[in-house]
Amino acid sequence: MSKRVVLAEKPSVGRDIARVLGCTKQGQGYLEGKDYVVTWALGHLVTLADPEAYDVKYKSWNLEDLPMLPKAFKFVVIKKTAKQFKVVKEQLLRKDVSEIVIATDAGREGELVARLIIEKSGVKKPLKRLWISSVTDQAIKQGFKSLKDGRHYDDLYASALARSEADWIVGMNATRALTTKYNAQLSCGRVQTPTLAMISKREEEIKQFKSEPYFGLTAMSESVKWTWQDGKSKSTQTFEEQRIDELMRALKEKPLQIIEVKKAEKKVYAPGLYDLTELQRDANKRFGFSAKETLSTMQKLYEHHKVLTYPRTDSRYLSTDIVATLPERLKAVAIGPYRGVANQLLKGKIVTNSSFVDNKKVSDHHAIIPTEQTPLLSDLSDKERKIYDLVVKRFLSVFMKPYIYEQTTMLAKMGQESFVAKGKRVVSLGFKEIYHVDEEEGDGLANLPVVEEGTVLSHIKLIKTSGRTQPPAYFNEATLLSAMENPSRYMNQASSEVVKTLKETGGLGTVATRADIIEKLFNSFMIEKKGQDIYLTSKGRQLLELAPKELKSPELTGQWEKKLQDISNGRLKRQQFVGQMREYASQIVHEIKGSEATYKHENLTTTKCPTCGKPMLAVNGKRGKMLVCQDRECNTKKTVSQLTNARCPNCHKKLELRGEGDSRMFSCVCGYREKLSTFNKRKSEQKKQGSKRDVQKYLREQEKQQEPMNSALADALAKLKL
């Protein structure tokens, strides 16, 4: 009897599928059952060959050998995972296997992972595609009931292959040209270089910004703060200090008469469900998580815990077929702090609307929402708990009523000058009930006293206010993600068609790649962090001066993404696009070769490289200070200091760990110093002393909630006799 081979992207997903399909016989790198053999990749097992695979001369980096334009691309098995490739290949080629089910991640990159393995194995068997957004048992069972013909995804594979080949052609040639021309480790690409250019443009805006003083006028009555308003512009500020001074003299001791009281009921609806970029933004704002941290945490919640759906989605909507599963998902999250709201929603009719259910706005995957699987909250790490909390609250909020408040606007006159006072009264918390008070950003509007039109107030105190105009803020990871998603304001003379394309294709990069792009810029020392703010390094600034102009614009990436989209929709041939990339790479190399610019290492130190003896470069890595060899072929790196999560006992700021071996020492900007060995000893003693107190504190918190938390730890602690 013939069998099907199921190819998953990772072992964890493969084992989940195998369990559902009844594959219990353990093999080396696979599981087998009566009808199925389930095996898995380890991410990519096959990749594009390095340049030296086409010609041995490319093993050495020489400017005169560029551009490198292979007639046909070669693919090689990745050495470190070659053993697993052999296992997968053996299963695919088995004589008792008649069909292959591709069960890699449902997206462009997942398709590429599987197809390259299948092609490199030389197997020619019918393909089926498992396309699911979560890896719960229920989702897997449903997915296998509705497998699609693999040929349906041929264009998606062509698009993925075109993206991979184009990045090789442009990235390899541009990076080698810049590196050999200027003898420095310089890399560029179609997404990372325009991202770098946006950071540079923001820094230039800040540098060129000229702060100006502005002034205003506040009138204080007994219980209301009134703000002066220009009669024509309605602005509450002016750059003319003399005008405010004159108003203070003219209005001194004059009464204030209320001429109008307006009340309006306002509704605020819950924000949309999360896609990956929105979740990364929120996690960075609230917890300081990097984009990479959020994605890897989401991946664990999806793959290991199976409590959230597929993370790499660019949609904030659900498709109509998901609506029937919503009650089960609400039951799954009816635990701990979410129990009350979830059960309340389950009592009534679950109402959906086009604000979060829309088939037209879902492509490969719907928004990130909880699965039908109930988590054991105590099994989640601190980061996992925080990300899960964000997603569950956002999910619950879309079913809840809007936040309603009554806004009061009072207009008054002092002489001929207008003053305004605004306040609000909460009518109904609505969806904000799910959020704690300290999680909500206040708007500074207090509840105003009840007063009638025509009321005259005396004994008014006038106060001159002042401030200065502020420059744009430096990018942090949250705002940089927003800029990558919508880069149109950083484009010069871009056509409306290109702007539209960038909007349709999701901007620079994809939801799946943006975190890696930002991480790559940090790891190649093009950018660095100061606090939460992102700054260009000297290396990043010089790269932008040396890189071809066209490669720095988001416009080029927008054009490419549109073409890749056309390939996936069957409107453009892959070969045509790759041919255009060959021409572009030749143009880039020609431009770099002809440049007369120079590159200067501005961060040279007197420390010699322990490997080659050349002076090392001082760089600020994402997690601390490092020394890096300037020789690109040597590439020796040495950690000088590392920012840790340990807190200073004096000022509670994060401590920096310096030195090597037993002599390592924690240091703080406040001047605090402590040896690592002393720190570890102190922490160990604190842990012993605090264990009883910590348990009692935990139990008190559980009693406060008055609802049982879904936690094995809570049950165990309750039985302890302290």
Each PLM stretch: what is its role?
Residues 28-56, 193-237, 398-446, 580-583:
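Structured, non-catalytic alpha/beta "coupling" segments that mediate domain-domain communication
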Residues 238-272, 280:
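Metal- or metallocofactor-binding catalytic centers and their adjacent structured scaffolds
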